[in-house]
């Protein structure tokens, strides 16, 4: 038995399921999860000392790679001045200014401590601003574990085979309308039936919680137009895509201006940080300037702000956005070419520094219904074969994978060499 397996067995005695976030338990792929001891650059090292090329990146935040010197030094410096004050700091201002500079639609920014907190707060704000109760989301999209957002959710909810969660009262769920991702007709139909009742549409601009699904042409433009016509707010949940798809986020990449934006993951550089922001007119409805209440003991934590600021400054240095996208594109194209070589039908999607692959005969994968048709068992087999060869992909067919600026030609070629061997095994097993 490996040390990771021993630790997993031990953890289950005191921690529900042995983990503190469900997808980490390998429920979507089977077997025991690896327990990580340390990480550096593009690599993680498990409790047995084995190294893996990491394409999970702490589920997105580690865009510079693990243990980056600039972030580490910023954290140490900030920690030496105190861990938390419960009072405003200048660092919060500089961080908000940088975010607004990079994401112009975020004229004002409120810092929080997680992506879930950001989306939950943004929706409360949208409801308060519009005076409407209903919200619209998309099947398979995940926006955190707030009650109203776990209706037909993606991510861990899909991995566990639960498109919605027990414990969410029916009275909450009835205010959440679910449309089909990449299908504007389904959006229009819901607005027609709920005229004047919908406060907002919340959407992942690239759906990353049912693997990786980009928008079809015209989808986001259509959402913007519909929201304008119906008096609803458009919320881009950029917790995953923020600063990863492009330095101006997915909204910059697709040239769409949402009313509100939520951020997380990359914005903290590995520390627990979230944020939401948007038009000043809307943000002024948040307390203390407005009636919509939102607060947090650790919001704007000085150590977390220092980490996030350092991360964004390095990330936005000239050439880094292109290098990250080029690296990810090379890897994604390599997966597709190797799958074709071995006669394995596969769809590979990639945007910026995120990618996903689907074992399927379909020509495209554009919605949750398409994802549900994919060969999950083949994904599980491929995941474990790659893991044995020292490549750590997202342990769920419903999760996107990520590269970092620390991933170089050496890591990409090693990954593709491993994939070539794993595809060969899978192809031979199918004969």
Curated annotation (Swiss-Prot):
N6-(pyridoxal phosphate)lysine: residues carrying this PTM: 265
Cofactor: pyridoxal 5'-phosphate
Species, as recorded: Aliivibrio fischeri (strain ATCC 700601 / ES114) (Vibrio fischeri)
Signal peptide per UniProt: none
Family, per entry: Belongs to the class-III pyridoxal-phosphate-dependent aminotransferase family. HemL subfamily.
Keyword check for Ribosomal protein: no
Pfam families, sorted: Aminotran_3
GO MF entries: glutamate-1-semialdehyde 2,1-aminomutase activity; pyridoxal phosphate binding; transaminase activity
CDD domains, sorted: OAT_like
Top EC category: isomerase
EC number: 5.4.3.8
Subunit structure: Homodimer.
Annotated GO CC locations: cytoplasm
GO biological process terms, semicolon-separated: protoporphyrinogen IX biosynthetic process
Subcellular location as annotated: Cytoplasm
Keyword Cytoplasm among UniProt keywords: yes
Domain of life, source organism: Bacteria
NCBIfam families per the UniProt record, alphabetical: hemL, PRK00062.1
Catalytic activity: (S)-4-amino-5-oxopentanoate = 5-aminolevulinate
Keyword vocabulary terms for this entry: Cytoplasm, Isomerase, Porphyrin biosynthesis, Pyridoxal phosphate
Principal localisation: cytoplasm
SUPFAM superfamilies per record: PLP-dependent transferases
Entry protein name: Glutamate-1-semialdehyde 2,1-aminomutase
Record pathway: Porphyrin-containing compound metabolism; protoporphyrin-IX biosynthesis; 5-aminolevulinate from L-glutamyl-tRNA(Glu): step 2/2
């Amino acid at each position: 038995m490996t040390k990771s397996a021993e630790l997993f067995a031990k953890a289950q005695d005191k921690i529900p399921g042995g983990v503190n976030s469900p997808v980490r338990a390998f429920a979507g792929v089977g077997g025991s999860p690896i327990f990580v001891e340390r990480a550096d650059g593009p690599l993680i090292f498990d409790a047995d000392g084995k190294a893996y090329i990491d394409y999970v990146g702490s589920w997105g935040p580690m865009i510079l790679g693990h243990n980056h010197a600039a972030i580490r030094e910023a954290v140490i410096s900030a920690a030496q001045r105190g861990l938390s004050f419960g009072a405003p700091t200048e660092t919060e201002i500089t961080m908000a200014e940088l975010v607004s500079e990079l994401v112009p639609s975020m004229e004002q920014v409120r810092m929080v401590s997680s992506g879930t907190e950001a989306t939950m707060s943004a929706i409360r704000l949208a409801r308060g601003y519009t005076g409407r109760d209903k919200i619209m989301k998309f099947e398979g999209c995940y926006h955190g574990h707030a009650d109203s957002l776990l209706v037909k959710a993606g991510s861990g909810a899909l991995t566990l085979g639960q498109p919605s969660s027990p414990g969410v009262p029916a009275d909450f769920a009835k205010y959440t309308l679910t449309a089909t991702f990449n299908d504007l007709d389904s959006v229009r139909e819901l607005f027609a039936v709920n005229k004047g009742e919908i406060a907002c549409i919340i959407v992942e601009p690239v759906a990353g919680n049912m693997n990786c699904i980009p928008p079809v042409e015209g989808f986001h433009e259509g959402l913007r137009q519909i929201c304008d016509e119906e008096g609803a707010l458009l919320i881009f949940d950029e917790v995953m895509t923020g600063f990863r798809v492009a330095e101006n986020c997915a909204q910059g990449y697709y040239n769409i201006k949402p009313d509100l934006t939520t951020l997380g993951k990359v914005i903290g550089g590995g520390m627990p940080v979230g944020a939401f922001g948007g038009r000043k007119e809307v943000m002024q409805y948040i307390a203390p300037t407005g009636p919509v209440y939102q607060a947090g003991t650790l919001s704007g934590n000085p150590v977390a702000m220092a980490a996030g600021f350092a991360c964004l400054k390095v990330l936005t240095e000239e050439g880094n956005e292109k290098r990250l996208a080029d690296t990810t594109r090379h890897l994604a194209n390599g997966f597709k070419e190797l799958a074709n070589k071995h006669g394995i039908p596969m769809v590979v999607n990639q945007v910026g520094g995120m990618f996903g692959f689907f074992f399927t005969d379909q020509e495209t994968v554009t919605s949750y219904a398409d994802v549900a048709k994919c060969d999950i068992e083949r994904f599980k087999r491929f995941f474990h074969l790659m893991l044995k060869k020292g490549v750590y992909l997202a342990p769920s067919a419903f999760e996107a994978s990520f590269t970092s600026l620390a991933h170089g030609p050496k890591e990409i070629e090693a990954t593709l060499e491993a994939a070539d061997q794993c595809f060969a095994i899978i192809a031979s097993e199918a004969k």
